[in-house]
Amino acid sequence: MKILIGLAILFFNAAGAPQPSALQQQNTALTAIAGPDRVVVLPSKTFLNGYVGYGDPPRRERRRNEPTPPPPPNPGPAPIAGWSKESGPGPVVFADAKALSTTAAFTAPGAYVLKLTADNGQARAFSTLSVIVDTPPPATHLNAVYTKNYRINSPLWSHRAESLIVNWIPHCIDQINRGDLEQGPGGIDNFVEAGKKLAGQPHGNHKGYVFSNAWVHQTVEAMSIALMIDPQGDQEIIKAQAKMKATLDDWIPKILAAQEPDGYLQTAFTLPRIDGKGVVTPGPFNHWERRGDHEGYVAGYFLESALNHYLMTDKKDARLYNAAKKLADCWVSHIGPAPKKEWFDGHQEMEQALVRFGRFVNDMEGGGRGDAYIKLAKFLLDCRKNGGEYDQSHLPAVQQYEAVGHAVRAVYSYSGMADVAVETHDPEYHSAVRSLWDNIVNKKYYVTGGVGSGETSEGFGPNYSLRQNAYCESCSSCGLIFLQYKMNMAYGEAKYADLYEETLFNALLGSTDLEGKNFYYQNPLDSGTPRYPWHGCPCCVGNIPRTLLMLPTWMYAKTVDSLYVNLFVGSTATIEGVGGTDVQMVQVTDYPWDGNVSLTVNPVRQSRFSVRIRVPNRSVSGLYASTPEADGIASITVNGEALKPMIEKGYAVISRAWNAGDKIDFILPLKVQRVRSIDAIAATQSRVALRFGPLVYNIEQVDQDITQTLEPDSPLTAEWNGSLLGGVMVIQGVFAGGGKMTAIPNYVRNNRGPVPDPATLTPPPGGGRPAPRPPTSIVWIREK
């Protein structure tokens, strides 16, 4: 917030007549900007980076197609700046209250307001920022449940998983095997040619983007996870899984042959490169020299793919796992404090992957074997500075409090920061990642759980700028799920799982069509474009299925004496190492169509531990309010006996000695809800969204005129339609004009239109874009 108080400054022409244009008056006003609101986790301090000057400060990044800003205005007298505490329950100590860049320290938790004052002797300007000071984080954190062999028995998820396994992943395999793609080239052929070069044989050039290896690694991971799903006799799934096994047998030797002797692996650095004009650059290409070469992006996906491949083989095939350690060791050998190289990558997948991989190596091997990878993650994040907002290098990581720049890079970076905060117990990392989470969820978050409004190159826009025709890239939804999940691991609070459920069921689940043959790169809430089979930048194609199919990881978390239930999906999975035993968990539920959930707890032997069940909260984000209320758990029984469990951090806690066959039954309230946004979001004023449980709904032109208006209190009902879109709960109502209204879940939107011709594929980001089509499916309905 900024407040301007002072004198207008006028410009004069040669004759002495004043020429106070509106732009000049705006650009010459004395201005103070304190900076973003933030969270401080004790005993951390907060970093203040204020601005005092005339007019708005220069931005590091301009929005897409924004004209070059005018030159800076002639300043008035040099202003004097000063920081002060305006309100709060305890003292605030500024390192230097007269410096724009300084720190503030707190001793007491609570809500504070800090003020920055600018004074030039003629005028004064003020700006404030809010600080929430919180107590230190818990000393321990939740532990991951690795996705291993599991079974899905959910009507919704069984169909979605089958479409990914039978159609989408095999389609990705076929595309990656092709050497003639014009859109999104650069598949397994790059590894083949790199292997030839390393073997001293004649070879071709690198195809596609420098980061094209990424979707190969993603697809390897997606195949590995898909092979851990019990086909339950489904012949189509069995056939598709056989294709995946054969593909892995074919691809893995080719990938390993492309790894350089020191462990480095990225074929764009091994092979000559050819640009769009056919010009060949033979190399050599120096490692860790150009931040835009996506070295960490590619490497991080390889580490994650190796992790899940190793699990899929029950730790019997260590080829990719050992190669991933060799690659990570290569980075550790070259990147780090002097005499090693100081470095950060332009796309932060390595930062997201390293702690996950390091923990995994420690779990597999012990002895701190993975600790060096965790330390490298922190070093890479610590090196981020002196750059721009686009790749989150505009400030040191611990001084970042507002989500800015490219949304995928941002959520990957923040995901890594959450891991580092937990591993290092660094209060400055805790403060930064809590602040970034708060900024996203309460200022830059779509009702579908998507992020990235697209004003700044596929990125975050200003606070509350949530236009409905952009952007919500599928990869940003994947990254946001990882971020929310890691926040849940760090703080043990159910609200983070509430949010990744929202993103999973809405922004990401509908990124592929119902058949699993086409996908969306973007997921705007107002849309009129059909999905497409491939993309000029197919960065999402493997990311979508690897994230959606990792269900046991999203469903459960654990400590030595607690088992956390975060998602409700009909399924069978085994959680290892709770209460000194392994526990098979069997969920029986038709959620989200029905709120009845039955959990059967099957420990290998009797054991005492706590089962902690997430108590849903549909309104975690402060941007939206839903009515009527549909939070909580309506009733809960254990072996038929009713109980009222304690609620801790959003979880219903049931502590007892568990025996195989013990059953927990509970009911989750599911109601049709109207969702309205706060006034600060201009794009959604006089509009209402609908939801049922975790699902946000759309109305579509194929069913009605979507420009019609709803009365604010008109009756709405949920009705099951088994013949529509594979079987969905629809919301029925009547528009103000008397016409029937039918709303369908957001994830099944745009599944009743024509399938696009591959020749009409969307061009890659950064290129020319086709004119947007009028929306045929919308989330926010006009409200009378």
Label every PLM stretch briefly.
Residues 100-109, 654-656:
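Solvent-exposed segments in extracellular or luminal domains encompassing
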Residues 125-134:
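C-terminal edge beta-strand
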Residues 137-242, 246, 276-312, 348-371, ...:
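Aromatic (Trp/Tyr) and acidic
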Residues 433, 498-506, 511-602, 623-638, ...:
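C-terminal beta-rich recognition modules with glycine/proline-rich loops and embedded aromatic residues
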Residues 28-35:
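Proline-enriched interdomain boundary motifs that mark the N-terminal boundary
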Residues 49-58, 70-75, 86:
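Acidic, Ser/Thr
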Residues 80-104:
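Surface-exposed, flexible coil segments in extracellular/virion-facing regions
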